């Protein structure tokens, strides 16, 4: 048996002396134990300082002030059409996020299996999809599985254009609140040492692998020893590769503060302008059009910094200038130059 979390109490029958039982502890398991907490605010206070809590609330307030945000849990009821749409969107979010990180997605090979089986599990309340919507657009999607009083986080991603708003952090807090309301005591974030898991989790242990085999079979014992050593080598190599990736990523951001996705696509320069050009010199555009998707993060960041709601935002292309645009809000406007 593989990847058994320590909170599972597996009752093994008394083994005959003919059998041997070996436990090998492998990768770290990050989880949130909600036992003893009445609400998400209590957990937040126990896990974060006042400054971090204030920052999170500020991001939530800013997100909800700038966009028409809805939080939806699909648990026990979802149409197949909506399910297929959300899985398609989730895959796009994951691909873009991992391309930005320069990393590969560990569940990529299991994607079709997960998609084919999770729909029925949602209807049976053995799984759920949590979605944060901006209007009708999913900007954060999380698939979780449920059994007994445990919620197991499986797949999650968010729209990196909204990264300034801490959408991923808001996702975790909303799910903690939902877990408590639905009597789930453990929110398991699985393996992978990422900053958000370290920040949110109050318990870390090691997943276990269990081996049971006959004592009088030296080949089985040899096989188990070989498997354990292969796991050790594999985990060591993965850890070394992860730290190399982490160091490289931090170095790139230190030498060039622009994000990797920006560096691949374009360099964006912003200029504050005091007044708008004449109407004949500009053309209104819609950033929801795929042709202008490269402007979305710039527009959303402008909204964040200026507390501007989407309803007050207009975006224009400057007719007589190459790759030049204007983002206009109710209070101010900026010129955007794409190099």
Question: What label would you give each PLM region?
Answer:
Residues 4-16, 20-163, 267-339:
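A conserved beta-strand-loop-helix scaffold within acyl/acetyltransferase catalytic domains
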Residues 44-45, 103, 160-162, 178-179, ...:
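A short, structure-level motif marking secondary-structure boundaries and short turns
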Residues 47-52, 66-67, 74-80, 136, ...:
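A general structural signal for short secondary-structure boundary/capping elements
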Residues 112-222:
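Aromatic (often tryptophan-rich) hydrophobic motifs at membrane interfaces
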């Amino acid at each position: 048996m593989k990847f058994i979390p320590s909170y599972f109490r597996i009752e093994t029958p008394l083994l005959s002396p003919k059998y041997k039982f070996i436990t090998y502890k492998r990768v770290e398991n990050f989880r949130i134990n909600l036992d003893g907490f009445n609400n998400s605010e209590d957990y937040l206070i126990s896990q974060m300082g006042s400054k971090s809590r204030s920052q999170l609330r500020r991001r939530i307030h800013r997100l909800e002030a700038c966009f028409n945000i809805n939080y939806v849990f699909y648990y026990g009821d979802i149409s197949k059409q909506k399910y297929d749409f959300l899985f398609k969107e989730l895959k796009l979010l994951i691909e873009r996020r991992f391309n930005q990180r320069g990393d590969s997605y560990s569940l990529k090979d299991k994607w079709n299996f997960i998609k084919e089986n999770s729909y029925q599990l949602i209807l049976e309340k053995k799984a759920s999809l949590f979605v944060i919507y901006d209007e009708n657009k999913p900007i954060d999607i999380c698939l979780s599985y449920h059994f007994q009083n445990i919620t197991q986080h499986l797949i999650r991603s968010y729209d990196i254009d909204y990264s300034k708003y801490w959408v991923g952090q808001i996702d975790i807090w909303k799910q903690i609140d939902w877990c408590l309301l639905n009597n789930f005591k453990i929110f398991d974030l699985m393996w992978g040492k990422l900053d958000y898991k370290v920040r949110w989790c109050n318990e870390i242990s090691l997943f276990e692998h269990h081996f049971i085999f006959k004592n009088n079979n030296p080949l089985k014992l040899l096989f188990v020893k070989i498997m354990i050593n292969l796991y050790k080598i594999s985990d060591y190599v993965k850890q070394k590769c992860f730290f190399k990736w982490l160091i490289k990523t931090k170095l790139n951001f230190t030498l060039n503060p622009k994000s990797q996705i920006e560096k691949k696509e374009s360099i964006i320069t912003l200029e504050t302008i005091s007044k708008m050009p004449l109407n004949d010199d500009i053309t209104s555009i819609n950033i929801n059009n795929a042709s202008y998707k490269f402007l979305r993060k710039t527009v959303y960041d402008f909204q964040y910094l200026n507390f501007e709601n989407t309803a007050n935002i207009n975006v224009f292309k400057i007719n007589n200038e190459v790759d030049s645009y204007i983002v206009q809000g109710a209070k101010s406007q900026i010129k955007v130059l794409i190099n």
